[in-house]
Curated annotation (Swiss-Prot):
Subcellular location: Cytoplasm
Single GO term (MF): dTTP diphosphatase activity
GO cellular component: cytoplasm
Cofactor(s) it depends on: a divalent metal cation
Family: Belongs to the Maf family. YhdE subfamily.
Record protein name field: dTTP/UTP pyrophosphatase
HAMAP family to which the protein is assigned, alphabetical: Maf
SUPFAM superfamilies: ITPase-like (SSF52972)
Main localisation: cytoplasm
EC number: 3.6.1.9
A Pfam family: Maf
UniProt GO BP: nucleotide metabolic process
Active site per database record: D77
Length: 194
C-alpha cells in the first residue's frame, strides 16, 4: 500500500542494526542501506530526548550534500534513560551487569529519535516507552550476558530475547520502540510524504 505510493522516492536507511533493517522489511518498504562511521558523542548537558535527537541529527548530517532529489534518508538513535542518566551500549560484561542490575525492580524509559532528511529539509520525531523489570537475581543477569552478549543494545538488553520474556513485567508505549524503532510513528510519518 504505502510501498506503491512511495515509488517515486528512494528510502535510505543509515543503520547497521539488524532489528531496524528487519522492521523496514516488515513494514513492506523498499529501502537501501548506506552506512557512515559517526562518532556518537553528545554535549554532556543534554538530557533524555535531547540526546537521541542530537545523535539522530548528527548521523543524518554525515550525509550532507550527498542526497539526491528523490531520496529520503532515515537515521535514528536509541538510549535507555534511567535515574537521570543515559545508558547506551555496554563496553563490556561488567558494564552490562551494572546497567541491568541498576534497572532491576524499577521502571526506565527507552527513547528513540528518528530523523528523516531530504536534500532540502529534515524532520525529527521521537517516542518514549516505559519498561518495568522485576527484581532480578545476579545469576539471571550473568546468565543473560554470558549467553546473549547484549553489547550492541542500549541498556544492555534485548526485549525480544530470553531476558525480555523473563524480566519485563510491564511495557507502556511502543514495544518496537524498545527494539530501536517506533514503527507506527515511522510509517505514519512516511504516509504524510505522499
Amino acid at each position: 500500500m504505502l510501498k506503491e505510493k512511495l515509488k517515486k522516492y528512494k528510502i535510505i536507511l543509515a543503520s547497521g542494526s539488524p532489528r531496524r533493517q528487519q522492521f523496514f522489511k516488515d513494514l513492506d518498504l523498499d529501502f537501501e542501506i548506506r552506512l557512515k562511521d559517526v562518532e556518537e558523542i553528545y554535549p554532556p548537558e543534554l538530557k533524555a530526548v535531547e540526546i537521541t535527537n542530537f545523535l539522530a541529527e548528527l548521523k543524518a548530517n554525515a550525509f550532507e550534500g550527498e542526497l539526491k532529489e528523490n531520496e529520503i534518508l532515515v537515521t535514528s538513535d536509541t538510549i535507555v534513560w534511567h535515574q537521570n542518566k543515559a545508558l547506551g551500549k555496554p563496553k563490556n560484561a561488567e558494564d552490562a551487569f551494572q546497567m541491568i542490575k541498576s534497572m532491576s525492580n524499577t521502571t526506565h524509559e527507552v527513547i528513540t529519535s528518528v530523523c528523516f532528511k531530504t536534500n532540502t529539509a529534515f524532520t525529527l520525531l521521537h517516542d518514549v516507552t516505559k519498561v518495568t523489570f522485576k527484581d532480578l537475581s545476579d545469576e539471571s543477569i550473568l546468565y543473560y550476558i554470558e549467553n546473549y552478549k547484549p553489547y550492541d543494545k542500549a541498556g544492555a538488553y534485548g526485549i525480544q530475547e530470553w531476558f525480555g520474556f523473563m524480566a519485563v513485567t510491564k511495557v507502556e508505549g511502543s514495544y518496537t520502540n524498545v527494539m530501536g524503532l517506533p514503527t507506527a510513528k515511522v510509517y505514519e510519518y512516511l504516509t504524510t510524504l505522499v
